[in-house]
Regions:
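ATP-binding glycine-rich loop module of kinase domains
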Residues: 2-32
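The N-lobe alphaC helix and its flanking beta3-alphaC-beta4 segment of protein kinase-like domains
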Residues: 29-45
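Short beta-strand micro-motifs within the conserved protein kinase catalytic domain, predominantly
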Residues: 51-62
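Conserved short submotifs of the Hanks-type protein kinase catalytic core
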Residues: 60-73
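Conserved kinase catalytic-core helix
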Residues: 75-110, 128, 134
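An alpha-helical support segment within catalytic cores of ATP-dependent transferases
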Residues: 101-147, 157-159
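Active-site Asp-x-Gly
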Residues: 157-171
Length: 171
């Protein structure tokens, strides 16, 4: 296994055609399993995303196993080719629009997630009430929301196919 990325609490390894995302003890088992479940549910849309291959414990750490997608992130391509930034941004926006056309009814709802965050905030009760009322006044829909959609979460394969990664915050 080759370590290819490390961030606070997480390590990414490449093992042939598999990617292993290993979490430290600061991540809850429920959160890790939820990330795998989110990704499995989004797989059913037909969007290009890495397939979930398994959830396991490796060296005492919970780990998710996905198919490895060969390519560069859109963020890397933007840095390597600044003259193409407008083209890449148009591509990124088109991908966002395509993603928002999908429906994944088994995912949690963003509205519920925001209500929980408001309720658990330290704001005074009157501010929390106002935020809840404003949230309830927004239009209701069931569009797929990635939750962390940014150029670093889009991998472009050598043939130009985009794959969207990191579905831990999807609703």
């Amino acid at each position: 296994m080759e370590l290819i990325h490390e961030s606070v609490g997480k390590k990414l390894y490449r093992d042939g055609d598999r990617l292993i995302k290993s979490f430290d003890e600061s991540y809850s088992k429920a959160g890790i399993l939820n990330e795998a479940l989110n990704q499995a549910r989004v797989e059913e849309t037909g969007l290009n995303i890495p397939k979930v291959l398994g959830v396991t414990v490796v060296d005492g750490r919970w780990s998710l196993i996905w198919e490895y997608i060969e390519g560069e992130t859109l963020e890397s391509l933007m840095q390597m080719h600044p003259e193409k930034e407008d083209e890449y941004l148009d591509f990124f926006v088109d991908l966002q629009i395509r993603m928002s056309e999908e429906r994944v009814p088994l995912l949690g709802h963003l509205r519920d997630k925001m209500h929980m965050k408001i309720s658990s905030s330290a704001y005074p009760a009157t501010v929390r009430y106002d935020l809840h009322m404003r949230l309830d006044g927004l239009p209701r829909h069931n569009k797929l929301c990635h939750g962390d959609f940014q150029p670093s979460n889009v991998v472009i394969t050598p043939d130009g196919t985009p794959y969207i990664i990191d579905w831990s915050h999807a609703t």
